[in-house]
Structures are given as C-alpha cells and as structure tokens.
C-alpha cells in the first residue's frame, strides 16, 4: 500500500522537504502500470463472476457454507483490486496525488477494509478446518448451523471497525515543492497507528498459518496411516486448502516486510530496499486477489458445472437473437410428417397415374407367380383385373416380393410415367415401402392385409371406372388365392389354372 515516498514521513520528525535524497526517488515505473492494469483487467471480471456464481448458489440453498465463503472472498478481492486503480493513477503522475484529501482517505479506507476482511475471513476458515481435523467427533456436533453466516457478517463488521483510523488520519500533503502525496499517517500518530496496522494484520496471519499447518499435518498422518477420512465435504476441504495455501505463499512476503518496517521504525530511517520490498510485496497481494477465483474454479467441480451451465444458457440466448443460424435445420424437419402421407397416397394412386406403365410392370411380375396358368397373350388383360380388385397394398407388396424383377421392367415404359407423380414414387415411396411392407409377407400377416375391408374398399372405389370398361361382368375377389401363391410357390403353380380361368374370360377387353 505504501509507496517509497509515503513510507517514511514522521519516522524521525521529518516534515515537508526542500530537497530529495537518494532514498526519496520513486521506485515505480511504466512496467508497474502495465502489470497492475493487466491484473485489474483479469481479476475484476473474474471476481465479479465468482461473486455472482456463489451468490446464486447460496440463494438456491446449494452448498451454503462454501457459497458464503466464496461470496465474501470474491467481494474482498474485488474491492482490493478496485482500490489499486488509485495506485495506478498515482504511478502515472510520478507519485503526485491529484485527487485531494477526501479521495486519499477513501483510498486507504477501501484498501484497509478489503485487506482486513480477506485476512480475517481466511483466518476463521483455517481455524474451523483445524478444529474439524483435530476434533472430528466433537466439533461437528457442537458447531451451529448458521456459523458460516455469522462468521461472514462478523468479519465484515470487524474489518470496517479496524479500518476506521484510515477515515481520519490520511491526508494529501505537500512533500517537495508542488509534489503532493497521499499520506496515511503523520508525525506523532505514526508509531502507535503503524504498530496497530502491522500487529493487527500479522497476528491473524500467524494464527492462519499455524492452523493451516496443523490441518495439513493431520491430513498427512491420516493418509499415511490408511485411516478413513472423516471430513464429509471433500469439495469444500479441497477449495479451502487451495485458497489458504495460495494466501500463505503470496502474502507472507508482505507480512515479513511489514515486520522489518516496524523494526526500523523505532530509531532508524527506513532504507530504499525496504521501501521497494513494501511496494512489490503489495503486488503479490494483488496477484493473489487476481488468481483466487481461478483457483476456486480449479478446485471445485460444482462451480465448474455451474459455470458451464451459465455459459451454455448464455450461448443459447445469443443464438436466439440470430434466427438465421437455425434456417438450415428447418427443411430437415418439414418433410418428415409429409413423407409418410405421400407414400400412402402413392401406393394407392400408382395404378391410376398411368395404367399403361402399371400393366407393363405387372406383365413381368405376374408370370413368376403362376407361369403355367397365364399365357403371355393375356398379359395385358390379367393385370387389369388385378388392378381392379387387388388392394393397393397388394400392388406394392406384389412388386416387392421379387426384388430381382424390378430391373426387368420395360425401359421404354419408364419415360411414359406422369412426370408429376413418377419422381415422387421413385424418391419417396421406394425407400419407405420396404421396411413397412416387408414384414407383411409373413403367411399370417398377408391374409390380414387382404381381409381388411377399409383398404380394399378404398382401392376398389379408386379403380372402379377402369374396371367397368375392361370387364364384362362382376368378378369374384381373387385375394384368397394370392396368399397361397405367396406361401407355397411350388404347389399352387399346377393348381392355378383351375382358379384363374373364370377370371381370364374377358381378356379381349383392353388393347
């Protein structure tokens, strides 16, 4: 917090100076500004996101203990990084403070509240984990359920009270000619208030360090002894361990520099190296505040899952604002329900679209069913009867019984098909009829399809007009004979002449 110029006023009764010594040169330069700006750009959004995630998790009652800890810690780090903006402004002006005394007091108060709240919070966390590790049976039963809430509230109240002196004593004073600096303490109150600041920060840090070492030693002894872990919340313990370890490593240099400064404050004027130690150890605290949310995300699986959920919902909301990204998906869903209806219509309309093509296709397929009963001279008339009485479902099944005969169709009849109907039957009906009609070739399922009245009735009505022109009288339904020919292809070929001649009489009808 203290710069090289701010750290030494009042140590030996010094007032504003007319000349600068070697110890008064400002140690911070342009690279300090770059480093601090990078920390702010990275740490402020990260801590804000962490506070929002922890707050939403605590609001829904999921992991309240961990959520309250992370919320308080994120707010403390956010405020500490926000206070660094005043430090960047001071560096840019070469140590000159252009904002006046009120802003100077607000800067030190904000720094004191954020620093003290984080220190007190992690000290309470370390003490809680130490008691849980040393007294695993007694402490969980005697710990109140609302203890995390009470601790977080008490930490912020205590940090505010501890920072009250920074609302009273700091002021913007002239240091050399027109150079104005922001001083935290001055003259007679320097020694007692500096001791309160240093000891008030060092003693909680010492308690944190001792409790953390005891907790880790107990955990190592438990792991080495192959004893079952008694800590119920492994995710919370992992997050607490990560945060406390980083805090001890990155904030220990600042505490040591403060102790050295207190030792020199008694009778010796602090040197240039000690001033630099105070400045750059303060940068380590800023680095810790910047890395804290990333360490929490790395140690907590629940926070990572919550962050993925938030990012996915945000991406979905962004995509909804751009409906053009979903345009390619619409044509894929529209043909789905219409393809089935189109196949059903084509299976019935196919004999009516172009009778000449249907007759030619049946003339090739029909002789394979009864080659001895039907001569080739009647190959034109016989399919007419089949197209009149045979249900539309049988017309499709009849073509699918012999898949090898499909390539034998007359190539000259293919162009005669109606161009509006034939592409639909080729592109839509042919792929979808196979999985639907192939199971109907079973000897049990085939009579059921022929005996159903609604389907033949619809087929007879659609083909009634061609039948009246090509046949001289009513003909019996030949459907009972068709399943037998399909089930037993060897035997019915000899008996088929006895069943077919009554229907071959009107063969001279269509030409």
UniProtKB/Swiss-Prot annotation:
InterPro entries per the UniProt record, alphabetical: GPCR_Rhodpsn, GPCR_Rhodpsn_7TM, MRGPCRFAMILY
Gene: Gpr152
Cysteines joined through disulfide linkages: 104-182
Residue spans crossing the bilayer: 34-54, 66-86, 106-126, 149-169, 195-215, 259-279, 283-303
Protein name: Probable G-protein coupled receptor 152
Comp. bias intervals (Polar residues): 335-345, 369-386, 435-453, 462-473
Lineage: Eukaryota, Metazoa, Chordata, Craniata, Vertebrata
Keyword Electron transport: no
Domain of life assignment: Eukaryota
Species: Mus musculus (Mouse)
A molecular function (GO) term: identical protein binding
Family designation: Belongs to the G-protein coupled receptor 1 family.
Low complexity bias (residue ranges): 419-433
Region (Disordered): 1-20, 328-349, 361-386, 407-511
Record topology, Cytoplasmic segments: 55-65, 127-148, 216-258, 304-511
Chain segments annotated as coiled-coil in the UniProt record: none
Keywords assigned by UniProt, alphabetized: Cell membrane, Disulfide bond, G-protein coupled receptor, Membrane, Receptor, Transducer, Transmembrane, Transmembrane helix
UniProt topological domain (Extracellular) ranges: 1-33, 87-105, 170-194, 280-282
Role noted for this protein: Orphan receptor.
UniProt subcellular location: Cell membrane
Pfam hit, one: 7tm_1
Membrane topology of this protein: Multi-pass membrane protein
PROSITE patterns: G_PROTEIN_RECEP_F1_2 (PS50262)
Any one cellular-component term (Gene Ontology): plasma membrane
Keyword Chloroplast: no
């Amino acid at each position: 917090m203290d710069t090289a110029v701010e750290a030494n006023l009042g140590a030996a009764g010094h007032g504003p100076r007319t000349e600068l010594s070697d110890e008064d040169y400002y140690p911070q330069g342009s690279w300090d500004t770059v480093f601090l700006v990078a920390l702010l750009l990275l740490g402020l959004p990260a801590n804000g996101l962490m506070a929002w995630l922890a707050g939403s998790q605590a609001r829904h009652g999921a992991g309240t203990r961990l959520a309250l800890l992370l919320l308080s810690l994120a707010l403390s780090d956010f405020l500490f990084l926000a206070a660094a903006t005043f430090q960047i402004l001071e560096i840019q002006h070469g140590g000159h403070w252009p904002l006046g005394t009120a802003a100077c007091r607000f800067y030190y108060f904000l720094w004191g509240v954020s620093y003290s709240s984080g220190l007190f919070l992690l000290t309470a966390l370390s003490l809680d984990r130490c008691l849980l590790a040393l007294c695993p049976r007694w402490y969980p039963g005697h710990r109140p359920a609302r203890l995390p809430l009470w601790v977080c509230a008490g930490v912020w109240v205590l940090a505010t009270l501890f920072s009250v002196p920074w609302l009273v004593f700091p002021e913007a004073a002239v240091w050399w000619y027109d150079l104005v600096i922001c001083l935290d303490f001055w003259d007679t109150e320097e020694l007692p208030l500096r001791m309160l600041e240093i000891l008030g920060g060092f003693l909680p840090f010492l308690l944190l360090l001792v409790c953390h070492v005891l907790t880790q030693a107990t955990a190592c002894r438990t792991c080495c002894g192959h004893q079952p872990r008694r800590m119920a919340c492994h995710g919370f313990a992992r997050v607490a361990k990560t945060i406390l370890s980083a805090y001890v490593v990155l904030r220990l240099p600042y505490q040591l520099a403060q102790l050295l400064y207190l030792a020199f404050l008694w009778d010796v004027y602090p040197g240039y190296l000690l001033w630099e130690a105070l400045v750059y150890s303060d940068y380590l605290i800023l680095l810790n505040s910047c890395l804290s949310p990333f360490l929490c995300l790395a140690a907590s699986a629940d926070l990572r899952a919550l962050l993925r959920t938030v990012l996915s919902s945000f991406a979905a909301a962004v995509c909804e604002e751009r409906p053009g990204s979903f345009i390619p998906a619409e044509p894929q869903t529209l043909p789905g329900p219409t393809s089935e209806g189109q196949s059903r219509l084509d299976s019935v309309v196919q004999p009516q679209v172009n009778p000449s093509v249907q007759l030619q296709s049946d003339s090739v397929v029909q002789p394979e069913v009864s080659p001895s009963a039907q001569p080739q001279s009647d190959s034109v008339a016989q399919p007419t009867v089949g197209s009149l009485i045979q249900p539309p479902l049988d017309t499709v099944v009849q073509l699918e019984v012999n898949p090898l005969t499909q390539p034998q169709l007359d190539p000259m009849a293919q162009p005669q098909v109606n161009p509006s109907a034939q592409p639909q039957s080729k592109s839509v009906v042919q792929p979808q009829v196979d999985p639907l009609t192939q199971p109907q070739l079973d000897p049990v399922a085939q009579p059921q399809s022929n005996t159903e009245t609604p389907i033949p009735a619809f087929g007879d009505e659609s083909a009634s007009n061609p039948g009246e022109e090509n046949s001289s009288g009513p003909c019996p339904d030949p459907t009972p004979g068709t399943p037998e020919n399909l089930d037993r292809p060897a035997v019915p070929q000899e008996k088929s002449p006895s069943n077919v001649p009554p229907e071959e009489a009107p063969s001279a009808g269509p030409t």
